[in-house]
Amino acid sequence: MSYNNPYQLETPFEESYELDEGSSAIGAEGHDFVGFMNKISQINRDLDKYDHTINQVDSLHKRLLTEVNEEQASHLRHSLDNFVAQATDLQFKLKNEIKSAQRDGIHDTNKQAQAENSRQRFLKLIQDYRIVDSNYKEENKEQAKRQYMIIQPEATEDEVEAAISDVGGQQIFSQALLNANRRGEAKTALAEVQARHQELLKLEKSMAELTQLFNDMEELVIEQQENVDVIDKNVEDAQLDVEQGVGHTDKAVKSARKARKNKIRCWLIVFAIIVVVVVVVVVPAVVKTR
């Protein structure tokens, strides 16, 4: 799907590919990377589904804008609601999958690159979806205005805007119906405008959710960096503790050596005293005895 997206991101995403974890004899680290890449492949498949769902929503929007049969239009709206629900489910799933992939790759630059590619592609698809909704919203408003002008051709721009913005349009349209010359056509126009109004309410809700999702995915980068900073700080603290521990150990070794030297000196002094006693006391006594 191609849109004039001012926020389109140029980062290419990796094509998904399956890796057979069981057949790889590459050790624990290799198996970990294989498991991670299988997770990325699943994310890319879900991104493909999300892209397809957006295309379906866009196609149904265009068909609804040109459909004149009310029964067929009702069927199309039901299909549209189903695809919008599918898109919402995929958005929630992809957000969690990409967040998990970023956590798994926090220590590995290759994993980080793969997770970031998925995040960038998701952001682009969110923007594409916002453009689809925005275009449909504008077309809906224009059609609602044209329908209102059928029964109130002399209405001002403000009056038209108030009519299509009114919840249900009952109060304004009741007066318009009283003044209309062609009641049947006016009632048809009222039903059409009310249907458009409900579409506009859904679109506003969808666009608000997409904006919040886009902001959440942008903030994942900040959150990821904060996690890296915390880990780096913990590593630095651990290194400092090790260095301090080594310093304390060196001091202990020096103290032990000094204690041993003092102990040796004490024994030497004791030995010297014993020698002196022997020479001064014992030797003369032995000489006298002889």
Swiss-Prot record:
Its main location: membrane. GO terms for biological process: ascospore formation; ascospore-type prospore assembly; exocytosis; Golgi to plasma membrane transport; Golgi vesicle fusion to target membrane; intracellular protein transport; SNARE complex assembly; sporulation. Residues 1-265 are cytoplasmic. Disulfide bonds: none annotated. It is found in: Membrane. The chain crosses the membrane at residues 266-287. It comes from the Eukaryota. Residues 288-290 are extracellular. It is a single-pass type IV membrane protein. CDD domains: SNARE_Sso1, SynN. Pfam families: SNARE, Syntaxin. GO terms for cellular component: cell periphery; endomembrane system; fungal-type vacuole membrane; Golgi membrane; plasma membrane; prospore membrane; SNARE complex. Residues 190-252 form the t-SNARE coiled-coil homology domain. Keywords: Coiled coil, Membrane, Transmembrane, Transmembrane helix. GO terms for molecular function: phosphatidic acid binding; phosphatidylinositol-3,4-bisphosphate binding; phosphatidylinositol-3,5-bisphosphate binding; phosphatidylinositol-4,5-bisphosphate binding; SNAP receptor activity; SNARE binding. Belongs to the syntaxin family. Present with 450 molecules/cell in log phase SD medium. Required for vesicle fusion with the plasma membrane. PANTHER family: PROTEIN SSO1-RELATED, SYNTAXIN. This is Protein SSO1. It comes from Saccharomyces cerevisiae (strain ATCC 204508 / S288c) (Baker's yeast).
